[in-house]
Amino acid sequence: MEHKAPLVEFLGLTFNLSDMLMITITCLIVFIIAVAATRSLQLRPTGMQNFMEWVFDFVRGIINSTMDWQTGGRFLTLGVTLIMYVFVANMLGLPFSVHVNGELWWKSPTADATVTLTLAVMVVALTHYYGVKMKGASDYLRDYTRPVAWLFPLKIIEEFANTLTLGLRLFGNIYAGEILLGLLASLGTHYGVLGAVGASQFPIMVWQAFSIFVGTIQAFIFTMLTMVYMAHKVSHDH
């Protein structure tokens, strides 16, 4: 069964209430995790602080693999925020979905191309901003004509391609996972209680476990590519 999105019109613009709700919930969860992990800092970390320090070390490793730390250290907070936000967003639609009057209200916000493409545009725009800020406008613009001027149109195309692939890769993986979970759940309803337990629940649990793995990998890939694109804009050796 196909479920439509809850849409409202305001000042000539169309808003998806489900996306707005899930984006807000994702932000709140990330904020709560960050506050809980840093509420009482200790020299010997335990619990949530230990987890948060592991995340910082992991993102620090991503940055070090793409650019030198003197240049990339300032992007540590950005990287941690991205990987936590995308991971939480990817996980929200896995346990269940909520439908009200044929409208889908609870899902992963990253299962909507509008959300992922908007996030990709914001990230790529940020790389351009830091490219101009750290290298100067003239040196930044000259990068589009290096090593030869005729590469300029190809590099413009590359910028659009990077944005599209960054957003659509995330959307495609998460959306496909939720669609298959929905199909497996509906399979059980067609075969009754025994069929639901035997033919639906086990595949659902297996696919949910795989979707957790995919969602985690996609959060890593999104953050890694963000730092790769950032390195191309801010490093003088790119």
Curated annotation (Swiss-Prot):
It is a multi-pass membrane protein. GO terms for biological process: proton motive force-driven plasma membrane ATP synthesis. GO terms for cellular component: plasma membrane; proton-transporting ATP synthase complex. The chain crosses the membrane at residues 17-37, 75-95, 112-132, 179-199, 202-222. It is found in: Cell membrane. It comes from Bacillus sp. (strain PS3). It comes from the Bacteria. Disulfide bonds: none annotated. This is ATP synthase subunit a. Key component of the proton channel; it plays a direct role in the translocation of protons across the membrane.
